[in-house]
Amino acid sequence: MARVKRGVAAHAKHKKVLKAAKGFYGRRKNTIRTAKAAVDRAKQYAYRDRKVNKRNFRALWIQRINAAVREFGLTYGRFIDGLNKAGIEVDRKVLSDMAIHEPEAFGALVAAAKKALEYLKETGTANEFEGAVR
């Protein structure tokens, strides 16, 4: 059986790792063993932080909505409850964007949420709320 020499494949593999390690500090950018470890760790961090990024954005949207809603005399939790009672289904990303770029439209949503909450307070039920969007 012929001897298999991996020179070309190994060189390509090393080149791929070093390309991924470009911009790293010290030996991590040009020594195969340390570069491979650094690249593997970087991939783990990237995987983890793609999940964390989603959490961070949701928290940011909630903070923005809370700040905007407090100008109208509501808290974030009461506002979301009012929107649910009114049957308005808008996600937090859109609400945050509306609060920043379209304050009039956001104000209308806050008014609808307040109306639904007041109706709930008066009647004790939100099932027959006529202002609900269904």
Swiss-Prot record:
Q: Which GO terms describe its biological process?
A: ribosomal large subunit assembly; translation
Q: Is Ribonucleoprotein found in the keyword set?
A: yes
The signal peptide here is: none
Its domain of life reads: Bacteria
Q: Name one GO molecular function term.
A: rRNA binding
State the SUPFAM superfamilies in the record.
Answer: Ribosomal protein L20
**InterPro entries from the xrefs?**
Ribosomal_bL20, RIBOSOMAL_L20_CS, Ribosomal_protein_bL20_C
**UniProt keyword list:** Ribonucleoprotein, Ribosomal protein, RNA-binding, rRNA-binding
One GO CC term on file: ribonucleoprotein complex
Which Gene3D superfamilies does the record cross-reference, listed alphabetically?
6.10.160.10, Ribosomal protein L20
Q: Which Pfam families is this protein grouped with? A: Ribosomal_L20
Provide the function of this protein: Binds directly to 23S ribosomal RNA and is necessary for the in vitro assembly process of the 50S ribosomal subunit. It is not involved in the protein synthesizing functions of that subunit.
Q: Which NCBIfam families match?
A: rplT_bact
Stated family: Belongs to the bacterial ribosomal protein bL20 family.
Protein name per the record: Large ribosomal subunit protein bL20
Organism taxonomic ancestry:
Bacteria, Pseudomonadati, Pseudomonadota, Alphaproteobacteria, Hyphomicrobiales
